């Protein structure tokens, strides 16, 4: 192989590595079925055993939806932080609602999981992925924030400290704005 061929191969590899992140983003976009600015998909869910509600029942509140599974390591990193940094701050605020849905898991797994972890926020079943399928085709954890008008204002896939800090900052800013407006 001559010098020219070697340089051409190195240039090709450099371009390939530069384009690799875009392939990853495209895959994420394909797995996400909703977009920021969309109306939240309508769905009913069991808020407690035997009691059905609809997501539209919570219109007028800032809603955080978390899609997770008990076996998911990033989910198990994120949820204790949600407990401390979001739920303990806003859980008793009437203008805030938070729902964690266990993908492919029922009450039989979720109740003991919640008790073992010491979580005080609602962890609810999504045994058939019916709720998950409204938002995505794959990948957890996912967080979706819905504003008081039922519009999606934030979505994330996976867990990173930076992404989580940004989500907390958005919730803080939104809740402070509501407090100033007296809502």
PLM region descriptions:
Residues 60-62, 94-97, 121, 148:
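Loop/turn elements at helix/coil->beta-strand transitions in domains of secreted/extracellular proteins
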Residues 1-29:
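Bacterial Sec-dependent N-terminal signal peptides
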Residues 54-76:
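Short active-site neighborhood of thiol/selenol oxidoreductases, capturing the structured segment around
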Residues 177-183:
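Non-globular targeting/processing and membrane-anchoring segments
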Residues 40-41, 63, 140-142:
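Short loop/turn microsegments at loop-to-beta-strand junctions
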Residues 27-55:
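N-terminal "domain-start" segment that seeds a small globular fold
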Residues 113-119, 126-172:
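Thiol/disulfide oxidoreductase modules built on the thioredoxin-like
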Residues 76-117, 130-133:
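Structural microenvironment flanking redox-active thiols in thiol-disulfide oxidoreductases
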